[in-house]
Amino acid sequence: MKKKTSWPSIVIPCIIGLLSAGVYLFPFWIGVENRLYDFFLGLKSDVKEDSSIVLLDIDDVSIEKVGLYPWPRNTIAKGLEALTQLGAEFAVFDIEYIDKSPMSVDFTYLNGALKSEFAASFEEIGANVQDIFAALANNQITLPEAGIYGSELVDLIDQSRDTLYRHTKQVAIENDSYLGQAMRLFGSSFITVNMQDDPPSEGTEDLYAIAKERFVYPKLKVNAPLSDGRHSALVPIPEISRMAAGAGFTNVYIDSDGVRRRIRLTDNIGDTVFMQLAFSPLLKKLGAPEVVIDKNLVTLIGAVYDGKEENVSIPLDSSGMMLIRWPKKNYQNSFTHIPFYLLIDYAESGEKTASSLRLLRANQGWNLGPGYAPIDTCMQLWDESEELRRTALESGAVQDKEAWLTAVQTYWDTVKSFFETDYGTSVAHLFDEAKQAGNPEDAKLYDQVKADFGTLYANAATSYNRHTELETVLAGKLKDAFCIIGWSSTGTTDIGVNPFHSEYVNVGTHAAVANTILQRDFLQQAPVWVSALLAIAFSFGIIVVIRRFSTLVQIIAGVVLSVVVLIVNQLIFNVTGIYIFIISPVLALFVSFLTYSMVSFIISEREKSFLRKAFGTYLSGDVINEMIEDPSMLKLGGQKKWITAMFTDVKGFSTISQGFSMKKVSEL
């Protein structure tokens, strides 16, 4: 007899499958699914971090060393010049420069290099005056000769005056222009564009025109309709916008539960498309590939990875955003971090070295033997390098930049040779020899000048050693680096939540975006309809599998299969990076088997109760139990069976029993 399909095996999966497929219509379940996604992402192996990504932190230590933030823009410019010397490849500013800043005084230069220049110039003038009068007093020169020397001294004074005046003008800094020039000098500086939903403000047309001219990626192909996009943008001031190599928007998307899981790589104002802040310079780093935008995909055609051109497909979710492959570590422990103040320290230690050498040059000890040539060479090369730096800042020409960097390297090579010669020891011996050979009355003077020489030489050596120490440390980390600059001290409010940490400084978001694309370790969420179909399929499938088993086996099988589905989903996520929304399928599977098992149990118990009541008056309990175990026994016409009987009764019993009644036989 063919067994009929019971109504629960049809009705239950239909109802539960459809209900489970529709759970994503409710925001609550989307939030639960996001949390489950975070859990599965935590089980996935950690993403590899690209060593070229460096976060230049304006952190607590930097603020303590440099001063209250926000800093004058000339401070950032000085750090950018240091980055140029150290060979960094990109400087990405997560700092908005939408307002003009006042002019300021470069106190570092005023109290350092300029002060040293004044002291050295006047010491040199004073020493020359003293030498002329001493020579006259000792009848070493005649009055006419003194006149000649006097004329030369006047020329020296005029030259010093002009030089000091020119250098004094550098104390007043037009910070915005200086920062813009430093960005242009660096070459690959990228700034922010903040996309706005509000209409453009009056008078911003010129700034937006600069943005359209300079910040739109040229090799872009859009195959899908653009979204409604934004209505305006906050563009940095012209002094900076005209000098930066490019820009990108900083806007981020936050899920309903406050977690940043995804990012929009492109955004638009009308038909003008802008790139995300990290994505914009990254395209340049990857060889300026063609960018093709489709509905759920961004393709980089001809992107250069490890010297080879590749086509890289970046999957997007249903909203057109890329899932960020976040590192599991916290902000401080993810990627390479360098406090920004070290760049300032690097620049200032170089200036202090030059200032100390200039003071050392004014000491009379050089007259005792080596002459002024060794230190004069150093100072001449420093002045030349500074002049070339100013020229490069003003012109922005590549050849001027290279000339400056070459001059800087020549200067430091010369300074290295200067200190390797160890004039601190050799000149000290010359002082002792001159003291012994000279007038005893001058002994105290020799000791004083010798002590001054030693102090000045030690100061110069200390500054030089600090500079070379910083160069060794920084150059190893910053050579060809993709630097992201932002405020990360405890005073910042720019802190968000990612799938792993409740506090993650948002400067790191740009690092995570860049790293995701550099590693090509993309994540993808399958469309919701896939989960809906799986929910319906699992609802029917689980019942087909368990319907022939007992209730206990059904429960065990249902629980095991639910766990298996979760494990398989995790394996798929680990291997392919594709995450399938799993709540709906697992919910459908679990509720289907549980409901079916309960309904089947209730129906079974009801049938057993009916059989016991119907046949309990004229059938034994054992027979009823057999009927319950095998309901097919309940049919008309009986059963036809071939049965073999084996009699083992007492010999002759059959003959004897024939003479008794049935009752008597039963008693026997």
Predicted regions and their residues:
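Transmembrane alpha-helical segments that form the functional core of multipass membrane systems
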Residues: 508, 523-599
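Short gly/ser/thr-rich secondary-structure transition/capping motifs
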Residues: 37-39, 463-468, 625-630
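Regulatory cytosolic signal-relay segments
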Residues: 584-641, 655-659, 664-667
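Non-transmembrane functional regions of envelope-associated proteins
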Residues: 2-431, 442, 471, 475-547
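Active-site-flanking beta-strand signature of metal-NTP-handling nucleotidyl enzymes
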Residues: 485, 642-654
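Non-transmembrane alpha-helical coiled-coil
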Residues: 433-473, 479, 490-493
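Generic recognition of stable, solvent-exposed alpha-helical segments in well-folded globular domains
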Residues: 178, 235, 273-280, 509, ...
